[in-house]
C-alpha cells in the first residue's frame, strides 16, 4: 500500500522547510506519496481559504497542516476547514499551540507542538532576508540535533503505519526538552546536557522575541531585544553541534533512516548497516 499524505504549509516555523523531507530523506521511500501546497510566508484567513481546500484534490489518507501559532486567525480558520473535511488531519505548530490543545481535541484533530521552535524577531530594523535565513538555519540545527525532528519523524511514521493497517490514530504530542533528547538517545551525559541546554535556549528565544515584537513599542528598546534573541539561537545551535560532536567521538550517534520497504531502521556504529 502507498499512503498518500497531503501537507499544507502556511507561514513558516523552523520545522516547515524540512517537514516533508523528514518522511523521505533520500527520495526513495516506496510506501508514501506526498503532495505539498502552501501560501508562502503569509497565513491570513484569505490565504487559508484558498490553500486548504486544494489538498482535497489529492485524496490523501491523512493531512498535515503546519504554521506558526495555531491560535492565530488564519491557522484557526484552517483548523475549522480541516475539521469539516472527511480526512484525518494533524496540526503542527509552535509553543502558542499549547493553549489550543483542548480546541483541537474538540475539533477531532491531532497535533504535534514543537515547543523549541521559536518565533523569529520580525522587526524590520533587524530582519532582512539574510537574517531570516540565518535564524532559520540555527533553529533547524537545534531541532535536528537535539532530537525534536526525530520525534516528528517517529510520530508521523506511526500515523503512516496506522494508515497501512487501516486504523489511523491521531497523535497528541508536545515536544518538550525531555521528549526531544530522549528521541536523540544520547549516550554521553555531557552531550545530553548540551542538547538540553540548546533546546531550553530555543524556547527562551520565543519569549524574548514575543517581548520584542509585541510587548515593546520603543524602537531603541525593541531592536536590541530581538537582536539578543537571534544571538541566543546562534549560541544554541553551537551547543547542539557540540552535543553531536561528543557523540561522534564515541561513535554513538543514533541514525534512524527509512529502509527499503519504508520501515524505520536504526544504527549507531557509523561503519555498519542499519537494521
Each predicted region: which residue ranges?
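Anaerobic metallocofactor- and corrinoid-dependent redox/one-carbon enzyme cores
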Residues: 1-60, 67-73, 77-275
Amino acid at each position: 500500500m502507498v499512503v498518500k499524505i497531503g501537507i499544507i504549509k502556511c507561514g513558516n516555523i523552523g520545522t516547515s522547510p524540512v517537514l516533508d523531507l523528514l518522511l523521505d530523506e533520500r527520495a526513495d521511500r516506496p510506501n508514501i506519496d506526498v503532495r505539498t501546497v502552501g501560501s508562502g510566508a503569509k497565513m491570513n484567513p484569505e490565504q487559508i481559504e484558498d490553500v486548504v481546500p486544494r489538498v482535497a484534490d489529492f485524496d490523501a489518507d491523512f493531512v498535515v497542516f503546519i504554521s506558526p501559532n495555531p491560535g492565530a486567525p488564519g491557522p484557526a480558520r484552517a483548523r475549522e476547514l480541516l475539521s469539516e473535511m472527511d480526512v484525518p488531519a494533524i496540526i503542527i505548530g509552535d509553543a502558542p499551540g499549547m493553549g489550543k490543545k483542548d480546541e483541537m481535541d474538540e475539533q477531532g484533530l491531532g497535533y504535534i507542538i514543537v515547543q523549541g521552535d521559536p518565533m523569529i524577531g520580525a522587526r524590520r530594523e533587524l530582519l532582512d532576508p539574510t537574517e531570516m535565513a540565518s535564524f532559520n538555519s540555527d533553529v533547524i540545527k537545534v531541532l535536528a540535533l537535539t532530537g525534536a525532528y526525530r520525534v516528528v519523524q517517529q510520530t508521523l511514521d506511526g500515523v503512516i503505519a496506522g494508515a497501512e493497517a487501516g486504523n489511523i490514530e491521531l497523535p497528541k504530542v508536545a515536544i518538550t526538552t525531555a521528549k526531544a533528547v530522549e528521541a536523540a538517545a544520547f549516550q554521553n551525559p555531557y552531550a545530553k546536557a548540551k542538547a538540553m541546554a540548546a533546546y531550553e535556549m530555543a524556547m527562551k528565544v520565543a519569549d524574548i522575541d514575543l517581548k520584542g515584537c509585541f510587548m515593546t513599542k520603543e524602537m531603541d528598546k525593541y531592536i536590541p531585544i530581538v537582536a539578543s534573541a537571534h544571538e541566543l539561537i546562534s549560541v544554541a545551535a553551537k551547543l547542539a553541534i557540540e552535543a553531536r560532536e561528543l557523540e561522534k567521538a564515541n561513535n554513538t550517534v543514533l541514525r534512524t533512516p527509512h529502509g527499503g520497504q519504508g520501515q524505520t531502521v536504526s544504527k549507531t556504529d557509523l561503519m555498519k548497516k542499519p537494521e
